[in-house]
């Protein structure tokens, strides 16, 4: 009993409660969505009898994954994060060993397992499918990347602004980004980039390099759009970007009206759904609703706005913002740099995913397949998220004083 009491005394209970609250709200939102999809249940076409849980399966999977994830987070919080960094060769081989086959193997089935599965019929072949479940190994590799990059930064320390050391760090960052780009998952590649930038900023990267990076990125994007837009990337990716800049197609970027309507349809419906809820929403299980493609996944925020209104969105995003702040704060209070960089990496991942997903739903950023943490449907992504939660709790509970005190 004393050991349990001591554990809860040194753990970040508020952080864990915020995570649990988000998971409960996610299951509620997905249940609400399922209820509007033909009553959610699978029925017999002739008799109308209920023969399965239908779309409620997503809410059930989310609930089950959240419970398992919470247990994993609690167990992981008891493990010193430093020991996980020390065994970096193990998780690097395991995680990237799952990622690399998807570069060359596309939709190949070995019994019930499909390698290089393109979930959602896109050009993103970064998934594995086992029976009725899908898994994206780059999410697990993201955790390994944060730990190894934190170790790299910890080894470099004050030498981070030396060109030779900075070049090595950029190589460490750009190699996984390039691998993920080849897979066709540019959304995840962008998240990796933001994670790396947050961690290097926390490590003391000079502002001159930060400004130079932004200037170079801006110039590269401008040149790409001006001279190479027909050669770089896949057509639909550029169309999605142009649809945000010119949603009415006044410049004629879309080759046909059909392409234009197909590209803008999801965000257009999401924008309507988000605004239709007004202040308090149309009701979780009653009232009108607007159909939005992937409302259970990338566009779950539009669904929340539809059923719970502006107030519901503020509650959801307010709690997520609190989690981001507490994650960065946990890193800042760490007594060693390794914990500080780990917190910065996980905080950067959360911040990036939330910002990009909200931007997609508000139609200010293109659709790039980035999910909303805790809320978007997906059992494997929830489990990976709670592993990150466990790491943050580990940093919190294994530090008794601040690095900056």
Place the predicted regions along the sequence by residue.
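Loop-to-helix entry and N-terminal half of a specific, functionally important transmembrane alpha helix
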Residues: 330-369
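Transmembrane alpha-helix boundary and packing residues in multipass membrane permease domains
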Residues: 74, 147, 151, 196, ...
């Amino acid at each position: 009993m004393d050991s349990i009491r001591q554990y809860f005394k040194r753990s970040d209970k508020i952080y864990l409660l915020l995570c649990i609250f988000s998971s409960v709200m996610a299951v509620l939102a997905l249940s609400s969505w399922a209820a509007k999809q033909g009553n959610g249940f699978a029925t017999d076409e002739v008799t109308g009898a209920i023969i399965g849980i239908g779309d409620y399966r997503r809410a059930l999977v989310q609930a089950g994954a959240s419970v398992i994830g919470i247990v994993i987070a609690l167990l992981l919080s008891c493990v010193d994060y430093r020991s996980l960094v020390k065994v970096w060769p193990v998780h690097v081989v395991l995680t990237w060993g799952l990622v690399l086959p998807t570069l060359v193997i596309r939709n190949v089935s070995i019994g019930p397992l499909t390698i290089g599965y393109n979930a959602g019929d896109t050009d993103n072949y970064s998934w594995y499918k086992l029976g009725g479940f899908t898994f994206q190994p780059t999410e697990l590799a993201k955790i390994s990347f944060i730990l190894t990059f934190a170790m790299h930064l910890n080894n470099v320390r004050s030498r981070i602004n030396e060109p030779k050391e900075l070049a090595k760090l950029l190589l460490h960052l750009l190699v996984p980004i390039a691998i993920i780009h080849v897979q066709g998952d540019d959304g995840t590649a962008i998240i990796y980039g933001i994670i790396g930038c947050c961690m290097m900023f926390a490590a003391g990267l000079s502002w001159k390099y930060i400004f130079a990076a932004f200037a170079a990125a801006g110039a590269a994007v401008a040149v790409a759009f001006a001279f190479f837009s027909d050669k770089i990337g896949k057509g639909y990716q550029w169309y999605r970007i142009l649809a945000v800049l010119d949603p009415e197609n006044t410049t004629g970027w879309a080759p046909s009206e059909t392409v234009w309507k197909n590209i803008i349809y999801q965000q257009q419906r999401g924008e309507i759904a988000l605004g239709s809820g007004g202040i308090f929403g149309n009701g979780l299980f009653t009232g009108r609703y607007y159909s939005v493609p992937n409302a259970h996944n990338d566009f779950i925020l539009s669904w929340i706005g539809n059923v719970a209104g502006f107030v519901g969105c503020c509650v959801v995003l307010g709690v997520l913002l609190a989690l981001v702040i507490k994650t960065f704060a946990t890193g800042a209070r760490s007594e060693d740099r390794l914990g500080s960089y780990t917190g910065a990496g996980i905080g950067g991942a959360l911040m990036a995913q939330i910002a990009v997903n909200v931007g997609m739903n508000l139609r200010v950023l293109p659709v790039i397949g980035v999910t909303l943490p805790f809320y978007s449907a997906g059992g494997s992504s929830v489990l990976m998220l709670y592993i990150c939660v466990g790491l943050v709790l580990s940093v919190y509970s294994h530090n008794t004083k601040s690095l900056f005190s």
